[in-house]
C-alpha cells in the first residue's frame, strides 16, 4: 500500500516555494522614476490623472453659503487651467458640493453655483468651455461625516474630475 502525503506532499510544497521565489526574483529593481510638477514626491506620469490630482490639485473649498472663489481657490484653479490647456485630450466634470446643513434643494442649487463658478474661471483661463460639464451633488456626497464645523468646511467644495481622454471634437 502507498501512503498518501509523504513525498508527494513535500514535492508539491517545494514546487509552490519555488514559484514564489521565482516571482519575487522577477520583481522591480531600482528606484522608480519620479514624475510630476509638484514637490510632493509623488510618482505620477506627466499628463496622467494621478499627476492632476496629486500635483495640481482637484479640490477647491468655499465659505459657508457662498460660491465665491477665494484667493487660494483661484490659485489652484489657475494650476488646473494650465494643466488642462497643456493636456487638451481631457474633458472634465466639475462636481459641486455643500455641507449637510440646509434643505436638499438649497444645497443642490448651491452646489450648482459652485460648479459654475469653477467652470467660468477655467474658461476665463483659456480652457474650452465645451470640455467642461458641471453637476451638483448638494449634500449627498460628503467627504467628512460629522456634525461639526471641521466636517462642514471639508464638504463645501468643488471637485474637478478628469474624464477619459477625448478626441478633440469641441
Explain the meaning of each model-derived region.
Residues 21-25:
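C-terminal motif of bacterial Sec signal peptides marking the signal peptidase cleavage site
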Residues 72-79, 105, 113, 117, ...:
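Extracytoplasmic/secreted proteins, especially bacterial periplasmic and envelope-associated proteins
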Residues 89-97, 112-143, 156-170:
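A non-catalytic structural micro-motif
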Residues 150-154:
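A generic structural micro-feature
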Residues 144-148:
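Short beta-alpha junctions and helix-cap segments that line functional grooves
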Amino acid at each position: 500500500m502507498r501512503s498518501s502525503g509523504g513525498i508527494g506532499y513535500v514535492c508539491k510544497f517545494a514546487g509552490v516555494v519555488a514559484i514564489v521565489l521565482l516571482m519575487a526574483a522577477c520583481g522591480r529593481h531600482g528606484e522608480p522614476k519620479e514624475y510630476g510638477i509638484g514637490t510632493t514626491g509623488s510618482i505620477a506620469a506627466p499628463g496622467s490623472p494621478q499627476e492632476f490630482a496629486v500635483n495640481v490639485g482637484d479640490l477647491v473649498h468655499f465659505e459657508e453659503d457662498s460660491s465665491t472663489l477665494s484667493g487660494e481657490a483661484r490659485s489652484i484653479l489657475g494650476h488646473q487651467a494650465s494643466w488642462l490647456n497643456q493636456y487638451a485630450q481631457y474633458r472634465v466634470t466639475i462636481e459641486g458640493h455643500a455641507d449637510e446643513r440646509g434643505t436638499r434643494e438649497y444645497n443642490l442649487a448651491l452646489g450648482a453655483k459652485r460648479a459654475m463658478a469653477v467652470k467660468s474661471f477655467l474658461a476665463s483661463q483659456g480652457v474650452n468651455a465645451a470640455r467642461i460639464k458641471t453637476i451638483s451633488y448638494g449634500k449627498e456626497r460628503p467627504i467628512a461625516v460629522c456634525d461639526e464645523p471641521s466636517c462642514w468646511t471639508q464638504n463645501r467644495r468643488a471637485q474637478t474630475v478628469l474624464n477619459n481622454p477625448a478626441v478633440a471634437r469641441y
